[in-house]
């Protein structure tokens, strides 16, 4: 092996180590910034109140289709047998009684139940938007349609999947010894597969952000692993320690269910944070990083890109923006885009591309400075991509902004008070 190839391999290894270490630090910061444990506690509390209305919607959808009626009990048993701790199974009886008494509910009661369900779904969407650093939520009508589609289609797909599985496993192939072993193995694997598919769909559908499948899959895998660990831990504790029953008595199912929902949300949100971090992370060498305080340089370059795209009658999606401006992090890009949208300088089209909404020739720099609340740095720092046309234009504008400040900021602070009256005796 030549010396040149050896040097190249060592450089790649060092770069990979630096990339891995950088991603580890980035992931840890995102975990801390997302405050996932507080968010999981809030979602667990609202989820408990949404269980009854959720069950009403789910089984109401199944009741609307006579073909799925026979699968209601099977679906309920499958959920509680595989996803709920045994000590909290008494909740199943409560839900069944609530569904039997559905006809006795008043209009006000039904409105309250539906409102609690919508509040829970809205809280879930807000949490996921926060994890993916999305500032603008969906319009209310679009949000409601997505909620309703997920609940109805999800329920129908779950029932159809169980019916299909029952049909397949009833074939003569699965009546043999090997076939029965395979069917038993598949049924044991089914809960994890259901968890994995559902979490992937949640990551892809719920946030107001384009989440790629290659980012959602590792996040969902982490969430499923954590949920299985939680299941095992719950089973071990509840099977060996009965203190909680002596403390809570007949009410022991409620705190166990609440803790179970909380830990499940922690698992899902940790997976979401991993998926978000994978989509947001971009390894930047030192020379390509935007110095702190020079965000205005990135903003001016970004607007130059939008101006050029408008001349060609095009918009820019977020992946294209990051490819054109490698010094922008995903977080900074989202912040700049949201601010520019807030002041109606940018808008999104039906394909989620960003477009200029106003002519830059009539937008003063003062509006950008005041609205985006960016500082004008006085010191000189090496700037990435400074020699290309966009960098030259942005650097020239930045120099014009800070030149008058330099002479003012160079004077001693004491000179500001020379015209004040003398100190009192």
Curated annotation (Swiss-Prot):
Protein name per UniProt: UPF0761 membrane protein xcc-b100_3490
Pfam families: Virul_fac_BrkB
Mode of membrane association: Multi-pass membrane protein
Keyword Repeat among record annotations: no
NCBIfam families: PRK04214.1, yihY_not_rbn
HAMAP family: UPF0761 (MF_00672)
Cell compartments where the protein resides: Cell inner membrane
Keywords: Cell inner membrane, Cell membrane, Membrane, Transmembrane, Transmembrane helix
Record flagged with keyword Cell membrane: yes
Family the UniProt entry places it in: Belongs to the UPF0761 family.
Organism: Xanthomonas campestris pv. campestris (strain B100)
Transmembrane segments: 48-68, 105-125, 154-174, 182-202, 216-236, 250-270
GO cellular component term of the entry, any: plasma membrane
Source species, domain of life: Bacteria
